[in-house]
Amino acid sequence: METSLSELLDASAHIGHSTSKWNPKFFPFIHMTKKGIHIIDLIKTIQQISVACMFLKKEVRNGKRVLFVGTKNQASKVVEREAKKCQEFYINQRWPGGLLTNWPTIKLSLKKLQLLEEKEKLDHLGSTSKKEEASMKREIQKLNKYLNGIKGMKKPPDIIILVDPSREKTTISECQKLNIPTIGILDTNCNPKSVNVPIPANDDSIKAIDLIVSKLSTSIFKAKLENNQFIENSTENLNEHVK
């Protein structure tokens, strides 16, 4: 589904940062300056959304897995919702350092979380004391805070989508070390060369983040639907994505 100029304008996707905070490498994506604010060229935003969606469709059809990353307040809920809709993974709290570059350790943490949650389900049999139960619940809560969105991940993701890469420097660094392609929604204060597919937009606007992330999620959803890649209940989100 094509992105329209009016959609982006309504979402304030064109409003960048003040000219004093810009990154000169963002220049190709700037339309004009107005009252000390850089205005983003939304035609290029539309083009880049299209590039990102085509890339995702192609890769997902080939079985590639995607991780959505958005830890800022404006992105957190959107990232979780859209990742779940297309049955992919997400990180919306602090990035667990080494998630990509030290995957064996992260995998052990995921296994630990799985075992603790399985043990918790058996508590009704009286297999643990109240003190042990309280300690176990605290540990589960702690692990879930950062790992809940990557349960079921068997290996590092093949593609990462980031909201505001300037806040996700560790993620970017790990991706670059492992040559994992990245798609980034980024504002005028960011370096577009920090990601493989930059999408210029106001990354402080919840509406803009919501609009663009949902477009990316929809492209993943449709690619999976074509290939019958959904695990279960694949049609429950169909209406959301094919409107």
From Swiss-Prot:
InterPro entries: Ribosomal_uS2, Ribosomal_uS2_bac/mit/plastid, Ribosomal_uS2_CS, Ribosomal_uS2_flav_dom_sf. It is found in: Plastid, Chloroplast. GO terms for biological process: translation. Keywords: Chloroplast, Plastid, Ribonucleoprotein, Ribosomal protein. GO terms for molecular function: structural constituent of ribosome. PROSITE patterns: RIBOSOMAL_S2_1, RIBOSOMAL_S2_2. Gene3D superfamilies: Glucose-6-phosphate isomerase like protein, domain 1, Helix hairpin bin. Signal peptide: none annotated. Its main location: plastid. One of its GO terms (cellular component) is mitochondrial small ribosomal subunit. It holds the Pfam family Ribosomal_S2. Belongs to the universal ribosomal protein uS2 family. PANTHER family: 30S RIBOSOMAL PROTEIN S2 PROKARYOTIC AND ORGANELLAR, SMALL RIBOSOMAL SUBUNIT PROTEIN US2M. This is Small ribosomal subunit protein uS2c.
